[in-house]
Amino acid sequence: MATIDLNSDLGENTPDRPVSDDAAMLRIVTSANVSCGFHAGSPEGIRDTVLAASRAGVAIGAHPGYRDYENFGRERLDLPAATLQAHVEYQLGAVWALARSVGDAVVYVKPHGALYNTMAVDEATASVVVAAVKAVDPSLVLLGLAGGVALDVADRAGLPTAAEAFADRAYTPQGQLVSRKEPGAVLHDVDLVARRMVRLVEDGVVEAIDGTDVAVRAESLCVHGDSPGAVGMAAATRTALTGAGVEIAPFVAGAR
């Protein structure tokens, strides 16, 4: 039986900027990418999310991003390596401590937004983030874009890795995500997304934006919680996968 993890970006809500229904998503996903506070979220809200994930039996991951609250961490920042490493270590420490305070633990790291995308294509940035993760806890798994540079850098550094695909994002023929600035980058057809993910898990391919097939092997699928109809799309994706005989479970062995 095929097995796949479902992950979502959570802990990003604040009273002035609610973006997702975390409670609903935690009933669907098996791994939670919890905001570390730099791009979104508040200390209280992040702790609430960590506690809720723990109670739901969902694996907890840290979701560090650029220090860019205004743009939700979606703009690339040109930072000195030492600054970026300190920022990542700081963020990991925050969620690590909150998880510990509720009797749980962070088991993986998935960078956010522009940092994630930059790491997928830029070896220098990936090397800095990998160094930060190793400095905090070398047992943490780095979750990154399937086929991206970041996973190669982490593998060479001896950091555990897992490959990820995106349920609601369009792909280029080269296997990269289509920029959110481009038309058609985010998919909204629930049935289409569900079918795409079943095909990805069963056949290891996804249709690119130009209609060609791209090989994608992933251990986790991201179902975003901050897009319109996100909960319904995530639920439909899970239902389609289980209906196809796919087991849904955390990608980190022994996380739950």
Swiss-Prot record:
CDD domains: LamB_YcsF_like. GO terms for molecular function: 5-oxoprolinase (ATP-hydrolyzing) activity; ATP binding. Keywords: ATP-binding, Hydrolase, Nucleotide-binding. It comes from the Bacteria. Pfam families: LamB_YcsF. Its EC number is 3.5.2.9. It catalyses: 5-oxo-L-proline + ATP + 2 H2O = L-glutamate + ADP + phosphate + H(+). GO terms for biological process: carbohydrate metabolic process. Catalyzes the cleavage of 5-oxoproline to form L-glutamate coupled to the hydrolysis of ATP to ADP and inorganic phosphate. Forms a complex composed of PxpA, PxpB and PxpC. NCBIfam families: PRK05406.1-3, PRK05406.1-5. Belongs to the LamB/PxpA family. This is 5-oxoprolinase subunit A.
